[in-house]
Amino acid sequence: LMIKISNLSKSFSGQTVLDHLNLDIQKGEVVALIGSSGAGKSTFLRSLNYLETPDSGSIQIDDFKVDFSQITQEEILTLRRKLSMVFQQFNLFERRTALDNVKEGLVVVKKLSDEEATEIAKEELAKVGLSDREQHYPRHLSGGQKQRVAIARALAMKPDVLLLDEPTSALDPELVGEVERSIANAAKSGQTMVLVSHDMSFVAQVADKVLFLDKGKIIESGTP
């Protein structure tokens, strides 16, 4: 077992968004969350690495366990190192090249040397098919390329789990395939992932387990 999420709850102004969710995720498993808009899918993802503050519950990743009701600053940092997130909007540094965007976390968070960080960043950009775009700034990249840089940046951190929140929803239809291929390749390489997507054919292609969320509860789970 890789991750155990227990009793995860969250409400906004009295409205329950996550209702005592429990979930076990195995190492190397790709779990997809589906459900209508407002079902709590993005809040669930963002709560896992404390971008949203859960009201209660805990998460255990291997032997690292955090109780959300009494989490410390140090635990938040550790949690974010273990869980890397890719958002709908690419969140790249506009004034840095693709390569520097991928390197940033390796140097700042992981304290790697510039040389080591560059090597890893180049490897990850190659995996998403962007070796020829290393020196390009985001403004010179298509939406699909930007999202692939964001995926490379997340994977460069060697997270225990990759969290993907609607990674293709901001893209033009013709760019979706290239991003989905990058995610599918990461899944094949054994990367554990939790993914929110509206694209059911993509979910069927990459997910090992699909959870249907409604009103903050998992009401159904199965294989695609």
Regions found by a protein language model. Give the residues of each.
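H-loop/switch region of ABC-family ATPase nucleotide-binding domains
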Residues: 197-198
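Conserved ABC ATPase signature
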Residues: 137-141, 145
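A short, proline-enriched helix->beta-strand linker immediately N-terminal to the Walker B motif
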Residues: 156-160
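Catalytic Walker B motif of ABC-type/P-loop ATPase nucleotide-binding domains
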Residues: 162-165
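A short, surface-exposed alpha-helical micro-motif characterized by mixed small hydrophobic
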Residues: 203-205
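Helix N-cap at the start of a conserved alpha-helix in ABC-type nucleotide-binding domains
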Residues: 173-175
